[in-house]
């Protein structure tokens, strides 16, 4: 099973709590995180894109770097780890994304890929005057389908004459082309999102579910597997989890309860409000899971809370789910979290037993 890190491109990472570590996103922080992840044989690093935050006491995600420029910088200071940036497709024409991706492919030596998102938080785009109207909620995967067809044309042949409802290419050119086939990823959990991933993505991200229920996402992975079978493609699921670990289960649980006790209710209210804006995509979208009150303090990503041995065991359970090819991890404290993962958790994981021994060099 592959392991990735979801780098904190926005302030405070993924904990919406006054009791969680409070920090600003910087290149130096993310550089240290990704270099440490590479040292511990993580397979990939991904950054999201967020253009407006949730506010509240913690000013959650009000402060964000930009994904492509951040990952270009990280590509230049790493040598093995796969690097993924996220394109907010309403803000960037596909021909520009194609050229930026080809550039980072050159910087990274073929280690770059693109995560495509349609956009769900209306204020991100309204503030720039580019929200296409609420009908977009029901047509966003039609838009993304045209978008990725233009990308594939340009990366594959260097030229596109695509004509569609959303994009018109007239002998559009991109050169140089990427040195290796460019990987495209998506994070669809709705039926439309999974159908898109089944047709066009190399793999699909999904949320883990619950606290210490590592296989609860299995029905989602099964839906993705079934959708991919309809297209004759192999599209695995990569599952998002937060790791909160300590020497003992009780110590880890105490940290988790402390974070929940400091939940930033004002920021969480904003998230809930935004989740109700899309009345057209059904009930199975990512944002509806994010806003569920069960564990909203970390946007309801799957959460693994326990001793190092307990977390290792739960991650091995994740690996046992059919269709689960990887996990994307966040941590309550990224630098110490990656180090303890690499030193104390990963060596106990059966699904990572193939890794070579660590060098003595300090990450």
Swiss-Prot record:
InterPro entries: Luciferase-like_dom (IPR011251), Luciferase-like_sf (IPR036661), Pyrimidine_monooxygenase_RutA (IPR019914), SsuD_RutA_monooxygenase (IPR050172). Induction: Up-regulated by the nitrogen regulatory protein C (NtrC also called GlnG) and repressed by RutR. Keywords: Flavoprotein, FMN, Monooxygenase, NADP, Oxidoreductase. It holds the Pfam family Bac_luciferase. GO terms for biological process: alkanesulfonate catabolic process; nitrogen utilization; uracil catabolic process. The keyword NADP applies. Coiled coil: none annotated. One of its GO terms (molecular function) is alkanesulfonate monooxygenase activity. FMN binds at residues 49-50, 115, 124, 140-141, 190. Its EC number is 1.14.99.46. It catalyses: uracil + FMNH2 + NADH + O2 = (Z)-3-ureidoacrylate + FMN + NAD(+) + H2O + H(+); thymine + FMNH2 + NADH + O2 = (Z)-2-methylureidoacrylate + FMN + NAD(+) + H2O + H(+). The FMN-N(5)-oxide reacts spontaneously with NADH to produce FMN. Requires the flavin reductase RutF to regenerate FMN in vivo. NCBIfam families: RutA. Belongs to the NtaA/SnaA/DszA monooxygenase family. RutA subfamily. This is Pyrimidine monooxygenase RutA.
């Amino acid at each position: 099973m592959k392991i990735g890190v979801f780098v904190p491109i926005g302030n405070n990472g993924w904990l919406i709590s006054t009791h969680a570590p409070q920090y600003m996103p910087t290149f130096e922080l993310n550089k240290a995180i990704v270099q440490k992840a590479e040292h511990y044989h993580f397979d990939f690093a991904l950054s999201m894109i967020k253009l407006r935050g949730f506010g509240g006491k913690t000013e959650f995600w009000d402060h964000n770097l930009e994904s492509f420029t951040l990952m270009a910088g990280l590509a230049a200071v790493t040598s093995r780890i796969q690097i993924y940036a996220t394109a907010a497709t309403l803000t960037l024409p596909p021909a520009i994304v194609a050229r930026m991706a080809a550039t980072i492919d050159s910087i990274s030596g073929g280690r770059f890929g693109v995560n495509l998102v349609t956009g769900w938080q209306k204020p991100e785009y309204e503030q720039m005057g580019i929200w296409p109207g609420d009908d977009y909620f029901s047509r966003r995967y039609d838009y993304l389908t045209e978008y990725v067809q233009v990308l594939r044309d340009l990366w594959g042949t260097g030229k596109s004459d695509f004509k569609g409802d959303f994009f018109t290419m007239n002998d559009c050119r991109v050169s140089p082309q990427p040195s290796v086939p460019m990987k495209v990823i998506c994070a669809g959990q709705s039926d439309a999102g999974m159908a898109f991933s089944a047709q066009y993505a190399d793999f699909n991200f999904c949320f883990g579910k619950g606290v210490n229920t590592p296989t609860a996402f299995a029905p989602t992975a099964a839906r993705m597997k079934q959708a991919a079978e309809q297209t004759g493609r192999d599209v695995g699921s990569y599952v998002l989890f937060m790791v909160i670990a300590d020497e003992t289960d009780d110590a880890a649980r105490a940290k988790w309860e402390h974070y929940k006790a400091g939940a930033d209710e004002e920021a969480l209210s904003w998230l809930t409000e935004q989740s109700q804006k899309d009345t057209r995509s059904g009930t199975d979208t990512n944002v509806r899971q994010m806003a569920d009150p069960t564990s909203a303090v970390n946007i309801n990503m799957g959460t693994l809370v326990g001793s190092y041995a307990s977390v290792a065991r739960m991650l091995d359970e994740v690996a046992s789910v059919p269709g689960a090819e990887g996990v994307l991890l966040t941590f309550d404290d990224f630098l110490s979290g990656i180090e303890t993962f690499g030193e104390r958790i990963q060596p106990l994981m059966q699904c990572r037993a193939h890794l070579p021994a660590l060098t003595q060099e300090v990450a």
